[in-house]
Design a protein with these regions (language model features):
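Conserved strand-helix element at the start of the C-terminal RecA-like helicase core
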Residues: 97
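Extended redox/cofactor-interaction regions of prokaryotic respiratory oxidoreductases
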Residues: 1-38, 42, 46-90, 103, ...
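A glycine-rich, charged low-complexity "G-patch/RS-like" nucleic-acid-interacting patch
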Residues: 92-94
Length: 218
């Protein structure tokens, strides 16, 4: 049941056109901003029904004019099963079920979500935390990858990217995080673009802070 866009799975456009979207183990406003914006747009423009299985109604759910199925942590499996045949929620082949990473900690919950999708015809999508990391990989943000996730060592990939960019792409991999820190401290690099990174989460927090201070532009 779990499918990606290439196999006819869930896209942003599908979220906007769905009659009902069920959220389980997921708070879009906090964990998946693009999904939240699409659902808010759909609820306002089309009247899409957003149903959240959660312990409480979040501010994000209120912004989507959503409906809460109040569920104590650990009881999600029973709550999901209760949606079968429940006319008030209108879950059918026009619906989408979005499952967050937290649901994996609840015994039987993922199976229940798959069962709900199979019996109603609804589409099911898994939304892991930090889902944007996959987008960064596809954009070539790892030192040994080019856009599209193709290796820098792949000569054909370098030719393709070079043709699009109008440059000769070197075969030498870029710097990883530790390499960037070292280059900033040595003066080899002068500028730094940083986002969503806590120095305390790096291999050497003190060196990372020193590198940020050493950069001429951040």
């Amino acid at each position: 049941v779990l499918r990606g866009p290439g196999a006819g799975g869930v896209t942003y456009a599908d979220l906007e056109s769905a009659a009902t979207v069920v959220l389980v183990g997921l708070e879009p406003e906090d964990e998946a901003g693009m999904i939240f914006l699409r659902l808010r747009k759909a609820s306002r423009a089309r009247g899409t029904r957003v149903v959240s299985i959660a312990p409480y109604a979040s501010r994000g759910l209120a912004k989507m004019s959503g409906q809460l199925i109040r569920t104590a942590p650990g009881d999600e499996t029973a709550a999901i099963d209760s949606l079968l045949g429940h006319a008030d929620y209108g879950i059918d082949a026009t619906s989408v079920i979005l499952v967050g990473e937290r649901l994996a900690t609840v015994p039987g919950a993922l199976t229940a979500a798959a069962r709900l999708a199979a019996k109603t015809g609804a589409r099911l999508a898994w939304v892991p935390r930090r889902a944007g990391d996959r987008g960064a990989v596809e954009a070539g943000c790892l030192p040994n990858l080019l856009p599209g996730g193709r290796p820098v060592a792949d000569a054909a990939a370098r030719v393709d990217v070079g043709a699009d960019w109008g440059v000769d792409v070197p075969e030498t991999p870029g710097r990883d995080a530790d390499g960037i820190v070292a280059a900033l401290r040595s003066g080899e690099l002068g500028g730094l673009v940083i986002g969503g990174v806590d120095p305390d989460d790096t291999t050497d927090p003190a060196a990372t802070r020193a590198a940020i201070e050493a950069a001429s532009f951040v």
